[in-house]
Design a protein with these regions (language model features):
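Alpha-helical membrane and juxtamembrane elements of multi-pass inner-membrane transport
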Residues: 6-9, 22-25, 48, 63, ...
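Phosphate-binding loop that captures ATP/GTP phosphates
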Residues: 31-90
Length: 140
């Protein structure tokens, strides 16, 4: 675990199809060549495609994490993170897009705070809608 707080980078646009996800993946790849521990947080909660883009199988996702925090079942953040390689990890969007509506935005800061001392960089992929989830990420 690191002592310094991670740099948070949020990629956003108010229009869909502008390359947000591609940009996040390219930045993550670049950061990995610099040996910076990076986590991608897929906050395109209704239609996140980071996991399939990386061709990884996700066991637990963002919904599982926030649900467990809300219901006092949370143990450690690592249980919800999917490893891609030595330098890139993923906190995936919900596998079931219906779960996006069940995520309370107040837990986003809790999650980002827990991640901030574990990684050098937090990359956040968002959707194109300005909502409570995205407004919180803009403040980080």
């Amino acid at each position: 675990m690191q002592n310094a707080k991670a740099k948070t980078i949020t990629i956003t646009s108010v229009k869909g199809g502008t390359g947000k996800t591609t940009t996040v993946l390219n930045i993550a790849g670049l950061l990995s060549t610099r040996k910076l521990r990076t986590i991608i947080v897929d906050l395109d909660l209704h239609s996140g495609v980071i996991a399939p883009s990386l061709n990884v199988q996700v066991e637990n996702d963002f919904y599982d994490l926030t649900s467990d925090i809300a219901n006092n079942r949370f143990n450690q953040i690592e249980d919800y993170i999917t490893k891609y390689n030595d330098y890139i990890d993923l906190l995936a969007a919900p596998k079931d897009p219906r779960m996006a509506y069940k995520i309370d935005p107040k837990y986003i800061n809790v999650v980002l705070s827990r991640l901030s001392f574990k990684y050098d960089v937090i990359l956040i992929d968002t959707n194109h809608i300005i909502d409570g989830v995205n407004l919180i990420t803009y403040d980080n």
